[in-house]
Amino acid sequence: VPSRTQVVARQIRAATAARRPVVFLGPVMGGGPDGAAMKAHVAAGLPFIAGESAALTFADDLDRVRARGVEVVADAEASALAAEAVPAEASGAAGASGTADASDVGATGDVEATGDASRDTRPVVVRSGDLDVEGLRQVLQGLGVSPCFDAVCVAVQDHGFTSHGSNRVARFAFWEQALSDRRPLVDLFWPADDVPATFTRLRAATALATELGEGAPVLAADTGPAALYGAMPESGDAVLVNAGNGHTVCVVARDGRLAGVFEHHTSALDGASLERFLRRFLAGELTSAEVREDGGHGAVLAPGALEGLAGPMLVTGPRRDLLRGSGLALEFAAPHGDMMLTGCYGLLRAAGERGLAGRRRGGTS
């Protein structure tokens, strides 16, 4: 199943190819491919209108979004515009593959005007959100499965937002507080009402999960802790690494409690630099200042965190090959034989420990 960021990006690109304005509305969601598609749409000289909540997908500062050529309007105004526009799924702008027609794309990938005056030029509505609630319901119903959930678990990567200072520092402060309190890793999974306000994307995804669950309990987490918890052994003692597409996180867990954490952006790392950071982190030599100077988030290790800790470092995540062939003593973790579901297993494990699993409502888990 493609990520929502990819789906939304395809819908925007299709509208660009059809030379149609876009109305983008809904909650804040993950960026990346959708942001690139928005920039290409604006560069093609086409209007891109976004409700304030959806516009936060592209930057936490709406003035920065406006500077990129997006017309940012109140959510209510975006909804009114959407009422007179065509949904992306029904616009005909996206075909079965959701991609632009080849006749509209030049050799460089730029969108070209065809000069076809008969084209429908009404705006296309593109809905934001990390979960497509109605789409998921339709898939389940199409398979004959009742969309009645015992519980819904959701995880997204969220840098966090602060109106003052650095988002990178604010995100790492969440790790530092958890370590200072020596909290169990399971405490980094929150019921819907307890998701910290700084995690705006996760709160938005949690609201969609609540809508999907229709009253079922919801558990939410960042993707980093979800994957790490899925890979953590029953003993609760381990050095764990999740080499994700966005972030790489290493934690030291003792008796299931956080005793150390290092976090960086995966795009800034190669195998040699990651191994070097990990060695210095586990030696107690790496500082948050050094990591931040390199564009990462930070590093902190509790005194005595590694005393008596035996066994190899456990590595998971889609970018785990960064450490393949390294000189570190490590093991590639694939819970239940499927590395790409490590985060899902972490969510289910936390749900079970939080008492959410097994609450039968006669439907789907």
Feature roles, as predicted:
Residues 251-283:
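A beta-strand-loop signature enriched in Asp, Gly, Thr, and Trp
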